[in-house]
Amino acid sequence: MQRIPRAVAAAAAAVCALAGVSLRSQDFKKQVIYQIVTDRFYDGDTTNDNPAESPGLFDSTHTQWQAYWGGDLAGIQDQLSYIKGMGATAIWVSPVVNNENLNCTSSGISAPYHGYWARDFMNIEEHFGDNSNSFSAFDSLVAALHSNNMKMIVDEANNHSNPDNCGEMGSLYNNGTFMAAANNDPNGYFHHNPDISNYNDRYQLQYYTLEDLTDLNQENATIDAYLKSAASQLQSHHVDAFRLDAVKDVTWGWEYSFANSVYNNAPSFLYGEWDQSNTGDPLYPDSYKFANDSGISLLDFPLNTAIRDVFASNNNFSEIDSTINTENSNFTYPNDLVTFFDSQDESRLLTLNDDQNRLQEAMAFLLTGRGIPIIFYGDEQYLFNNTNGGNDPYNRVWMSSFNTGTTAYKIIAKLAGLRAANDAVGYGTWKQRWLNNDVYIYERQFFNDVVLVAINKNDTTGYSITGLYTALPPGTYTDYLGGLQNGNSLTVTSGSGGNNPANNYTIAPASVSVWQYQVNAATPEVGSIGPHVGQPGMTVTIAGDGFGSSQGSVLFGSSAAAIQSWSNTSVTFTVPNVSNGSYNVQLKNSGGTAANTIAFTVLAAKLIPVTFTVNNANPTNPGDYIFVTGNTVELGNWGTTFQTAIGPMLDPNYPNWFLNVSLPAGATVQFKFIDIQANGNVVWENGSNHQYTVPTSGTGYDTVNWQY
């Protein structure tokens, strides 16, 4: 489509700012995200291909894979009709901030085309925008997205600046003013530690260097303010959500305060990259503790592994089923997990298995499955490059085709429409209905809305499906995909208890069938709350169906929240002035009919990152860890388990332990340190509770001795 003229774009942006929650809603469960590596998508402005600020990093032949190739924000806007036609409702773009200006190799080109080598978080990369590093092209794209009722997700990399061993040597700027570099850091803006060698070591992950990238010290008050200001600036330019790079490698406690800062600024949605192979990963319990408590959802790496194993490597479907069941039992908000099977960091599925049926089946699974789906750019065009096993950078191919007629494109469009229309997909529960090595039949249900999906990944063999039960009401259902992936109709007869028998049938090879039923809700049904953690005064949105057009109430215990807006499917309110703790929030319609409750954590105040150190702590054995616990929800409300106490703390200088924790601004908190032993026993320190008054801004530090 034509790009919106800049004057019109500015006006549209102003309208978006006034439009409120409809465009800025925290509820992403019904979205379909299209991930774009900006430099590899489309060249909409050739004047920024070889800018004066960073010359010689562009390759017009698209043969030097570590060079810029010309894709930019204007190019994304040029192709917006293509993206929207596919059913995507949000785009996730690679980091847009100003990146390293110098070549990082002595032979060929090594440039930050990917966006992850920031030098200045406060302005836009000239290769993506313009020679003045202005927000003009960015604002135009965001305005165009919002005028199409689509959302903008920006990737933010809070872990690091740029490489510490080449080019600008990690140099960091604040809107053009030099702050520090890896070899010039008098104020301690960076950590100066070796590269991470043990990715299961909590201290190394958070304080060592990730692949030579100069590691930012978020506990430094200047860096804390800088990173939060960078996010705030993007929000002032109407960004709807953030994908947070490498959250596993950033100081975990600080990230709670970062999320809180973002939510204090404006409605948003945050999801982070916590790389792990499966639910057996040693730090898997840390991952769901982080997601449940921080307000930051996660990219679903365990499910990514399972999808790739099943659809590319022909593993048993039970791997997917087991992964989903495990995660659903661990994550408080599993429908907020962000799901994917391809990305900028791994070989594409078609490199692993060049079978378009398998790709299309995986897409259908992703789009009907639990979580918020991401389509990696070009998958709908079957793009891949097998050089070096298709690994980085060969997975970041040039987007050479925009064909709207591929089967994959059509499947995405159909199922994106289903996700928007049927609440079972975005909000529903998950139930396996039939399973063997090659066939997976699963059901999504949200009250009376039902979606049943049957996938056979075997390209040559059909299977007789007997004993299938479903929550679909009696009737005959046609394939929602209309046969795009060899689907068929299904007849359901009457049963009992939400288990209606389906007629026996043979599932075709290489097939996906989708059957669905939906009704208008007669009573209020809550499917989402976002964010799910915040202090009194924060804006929160509940989404679902059947709320009615007349205003009802939202209750935290007996305390009513102030309603900002009310519609049949979405209610925005202000968290009331209640005590900190966990609440089951209750929505009632104007007639007093109550919906199902949904969990929310009320904080005591906005969050400030504080580093606690306890010297000479209780001696520990392998598997024992020191935690902190205290008298506020931010300190675990005196919890004494791995999931409820705060930690584990870190011990690079054993027997001294430390931990960064986000605490309520201005509050005087009481706390103690405990030793949670490998067998579950808890050893408390003696003496009175420690006491600390949290700063009202910046960062804090407190050091005490273990009380024997």
Model segments located where?
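Substrate-binding/active-site clefts of carbohydrate-active enzymes
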Residues: 25-32, 39-237, 253-276, 280-283, ...
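A structural motif
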Residues: 36, 540-544, 554, 571-573, ...
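Aromatic-rich carbohydrate-binding modules that target alpha-glucans
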Residues: 56, 618-668, 676-695
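Active-site-proximal helices and loops of the catalytic beta/alpha 8
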Residues: 141-150, 160, 228-333, 337-340, ...
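Short proline/glycine-enriched turn/loop motifs at strand-loop junctions of beta-rich domains
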Residues: 470-475, 545-551, 620-624, 631-632, ...
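Structured interaction patches on ligand/partner-binding surfaces of diverse proteins
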Residues: 491-507, 676-708
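Beta-strand/beta-sandwich contexts
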Residues: 520-551, 592-605
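Conserved structural position at the C-terminal beta-strand
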Residues: 587-589, 675
